[in-house]
Curated annotation (Swiss-Prot):
SUPFAM superfamilies: Ribosomal protein L36. GO terms for cellular component: cytoplasm; ribonucleoprotein complex; ribosome. Belongs to the bacterial ribosomal protein bL36 family. This is Large ribosomal subunit protein bL36. The keyword Ribosomal protein applies. It comes from the Bacteria. GO terms for molecular function: structural constituent of ribosome. Transmembrane segments: none annotated. Keywords: Ribonucleoprotein, Ribosomal protein.
Length: 38
């Protein structure tokens, strides 16, 4: 899980979602692409 000031999809499988007011990226294809804003 990377924590970044700005999160962007890194591949076509990445999905941008909101959980508990936080913007996150989840990726089923490549778990290294998981990110969270903050």
């Amino acid at each position: 899980m990377k924590v970044r000031p700005s999160v962007k999809p890194m591949c076509e499988h990445c999905k941008v979602i909101r959980r508990k007011g936080r913007v996150m990226v989840i990726c089923p294809a490549n778990p290294k692409h998981k990110q969270r804003q903050g």
